[in-house]
Amino acid sequence: METLESELTCPICLELFEDPLLLPCAHSLCFNCAHRILVSHCATNESVESITAFQCPTCRHVITLSQRGLDGLKRNVTLQNIIDRFQKASVSGPNSPSETRRERAFDANTMTSAEKVLCQFCDQDPAQDAVKTCVTCEVSYCDECLKATHPNKKPFTGHRLIEPIPDSHIRGLMCLEHEDEKVNMYCVTDDQLICALCKLVGRHRDHQVAALSERYDKLKQNLESNLTNLIKRNTELETLLAKLIQTCQHVEVNASRQEAKLTEECDLLIEIIQQRRQIIGTKIKEGKVMRLRKLAQQIANCKQCIERSASLISQAEHSLKENDHARFLQTAKNITERVSMATASSQVLIPEINLNDTFDTFALDFSREKKLLECLDYLTAPNPPTIREELCTASYDTITVHWTSDDEFSVVSYELQYTIFTGQANVVSLCNSADSWMIVPNIKQNHYTVHGLQSGTKYIFMVKAINQAGSRSSEPGKLKTNSQPFKLDPKSAHRKLKVSHDNLTVERDESSSKKSHTPERFTSQGSYGVAGNVFIDSGRHYWEVVISGSTWYAIGLAYKSAPKHEWIGKNSASWALCRCNNNWVVRHNSKEIPIEPAPHLRRVGILLDYDNGSIAFYDALNSIHLYTFDVAFAQPVCPTFTVWNKCLTIITGLPIPDHLDCTEQLP
């Protein structure tokens, strides 16, 4: 509060600003203090109005005045509002730093105001102190005059009486140029309050003016709007501030934890080094003692050998000086044997003396450990992996996901997450929903195969790289399973149809051998049909049929209960796209709908969405939609084909094309 109070203090009077002026240099000054500055610059016979400039007492910037003098400077209304609120807070606050001084000032002002507010109705001189001010009459009264002028009867009982206040507060804002006139309009040109005379005969007569109420509503609305935006912005800033403070707290806590961990780990390393130092030092001492003991023994042996040899050498030299042959031969034989024995014994000691017992091949090489210590650093979470969609593979119920990592050496394990993709809009929400994800933890390689997936379904995959410091996830990757693969069932083929060895092509063959009758075989004359070897009861599936010159065929699906003696589409248990020469129709329950304009099909695409109940036919080569059946499936369905001429070839186990994938079309 003391710091704020110093900011609200006038540099001249050292009191809180009163009626502050906003100077062009952005500093403020009390109106009366500015007036006193002008008076101080006046010569003896010079008026204040003749002063056209003065210096700001704060920054010494020269303030140039207009013809209006100080009245031409704008009031610092914002500063005045802050001072008013500060004064209220200071008076009401029991622990205000300037409470005592403010109480004295408040009491003094009260006494001064009480002395100055005199009765305006008294005939006495001086007038008595006013006890009430009548807002209705705009007059202050002493007790005696109040009783005389405001008896307790109408209309005086309707007058509003308040504690005595100065006359200027009763009468409202007065015009700066016409002291006896109240301001009652607003000059838009000068952005100033004026009276009627200013508009009629004053310098504002040619200016654009507006009613106070109009300007009031506009300014109030603008202020309310700005205030709302400011409050909203402050709320956002407070939320951001709270998050920043919370983040700072987390940083402090985590940093303290890491510092403690660092100290603990370094102390442990130092302890290990000291232990190793002690162990290696002990080994060195033991090695030194052992080697010195051996060397001491060798030294003693050498000395003993030298002493013996010296005595023998002396005797031998003495014998060599003997010139008497008989005497020489008498002593030389014994001496020669002793010299030979001494030479042999000294030769035995020589290899031991040359043993490597000087520690010259012993070395302390800690260069590798030093490099490791120099590389010590805190561990961070690994970089996010990247899913390599071009390397990923899929079948109708499996997807093998491949990914790469920039810092694979720092990864302890990977975690694979996946879920069904239901549209672009749900990617973000799915990432925030843990319940919808399947999780495969503790993967050590850069690939993984997920089994048991739905066929013809798109999935979102994310890979998380994990180490002791944390984890980071890859961007979502979208992969989809293929459709259910199937082949033609030869046991169901009509006797006049021939199925290829790979069970993928069927053709009309009048010369086909007779086939045994089975319940699943098409039998009726003209119903030259063959079924697939699967029954589908869930998921989305897509396959294509290559038209190899046939001009009379039907392609569709049927329940297991569909009659084998009828064409497909002729009953309620089958649906078909048919070509009869140049006529193209879709057929169900004997109801035919023509396809117009007639397509020129070389390959037909069939999209079955069992769960959502639809069978759609497409021109596969030109990506043109032909027709869609909406079906509430009651039983599993089987792909079914009828051919009256030439042949048809099926291509199955395909992924659903992107332009047919409804999930790609969601917003």
UniProtKB/Swiss-Prot annotation:
Residues 499-520 have a biased composition (Basic and acidic residues). It is linked to Opitz GBBB syndrome: A congenital midline malformation syndrome characterized by hypertelorism, genital-urinary defects such as hypospadias in males and splayed labia in females, cleft lip/palate, laryngotracheoesophageal abnormalities, imperforate anus, developmental delay and congenital heart defects. Has E3 ubiquitin ligase activity towards IGBP1, promoting its monoubiquitination, which results in deprotection of the catalytic subunit of protein phosphatase PP2A, and its subsequent degradation by polyubiquitination. One of its GO terms (cellular component) is cytosol. The keyword Nucleotide-binding does not apply. Residues 471-485 have a biased composition (Polar residues). PROSITE patterns: B302_SPRY, COS, FN3, ZF_BBOX, ZF_RING_1, ZF_RING_2. It is found in: Cytoplasm; Cytoplasm, Cytoskeleton; Cytoplasm, Cytoskeleton, Spindle. Keywords: Coiled coil, Cytoplasm, Cytoskeleton, Disease variant, Metal-binding, Microtubule, Phosphoprotein, Repeat, Transferase, Ubl conjugation pathway, Zinc, Zinc-finger. Residues 482-659 form the B30.2/SPRY domain. It comes from Homo sapiens. The lineage of its organism: Eukaryota, Metazoa, Chordata, Craniata, Vertebrata. This is E3 ubiquitin-protein ligase Midline-1. Residues 320-379 form the COS domain. Belongs to the TRIM/RBCC family. It holds the Pfam family fn3. A zinc finger (RING-type) spans 10-60. Its EC number is 2.3.2.27. Residues 205-264 form a coiled coil. Phosphorylated on serine and threonine residues. In the fetus, highest expression found in kidney, followed by brain and lung. Expressed at low levels in fetal liver. In the adult, most abundant in heart, placenta and brain. Zn(2+) 3 binds at residues 175, 178, 198, 204. Homodimer or heterodimer with MID2. Interacts with IGBP1. Interacts with TRIM16. A zinc finger (B box-type) spans 116-165, 172-212. InterPro entries: B30.2/SPRY, B30.2/SPRY_sf, Bbox_C, Butyrophylin_SPRY, ConA-like_dom_sf, COS_domain, E3_ligase_FN3/SPRY, FN3_dom. Zn(2+) 1 binds at residues 119, 122, 142, 145. GO terms for molecular function: enzyme binding; identical protein binding; microtubule binding; phosphoprotein binding; protein homodimerization activity; transferase activity; ubiquitin protein ligase binding; zinc ion binding. Residues 471-524 are annotated as: Disordered.
